[in-house]
Amino acid sequence: MKQGIHPEYHQVIFLDTTTNFKFLSGSTKTSSEMMEWEDGKEYPVIRLDISSDSHPFYTGRQKFAAADGRVERFNKKFGLKSNN
């Protein structure tokens, strides 16, 4: 590895602002805001709008829309009947 070209990698706390869910992970991102973690050490805090704790896909609150294909929409729009 070349010296001096890689960003500094350190532990940070990611905070989901929607649910106040926190997790500690390694990152090159940093922040001036600090927070104490469960181990008693202080780490920089990165605020997230959405994480796996609040995203509908991971929480099971996802809504599935009936997605018609382009051909079905065309036939429905112009009144054509399918051959099936």
Curated annotation (Swiss-Prot):
Gene Ontology MF term list: structural constituent of ribosome
Listed InterPro entries: Ribosomal_bL28/bL31-like_sf, Ribosomal_bL31, Ribosomal_bL31_B, Ribosomal_bL31_sf
PROSITE patterns on file: RIBOSOMAL_L31
Biological processes per GO annotation: translation
Keywords tagged on the record: Ribonucleoprotein, Ribosomal protein
Coiled-coil segments: none
Any one Gene Ontology cellular component term annotated for this protein: ribosome
Family: Belongs to the bacterial ribosomal protein bL31 family. Type B subfamily.
Protein name: Large ribosomal subunit protein bL31B
Organism: Staphylococcus aureus (strain NCTC 8325 / PS 47)
Gene that specifies this protein: rpmE2
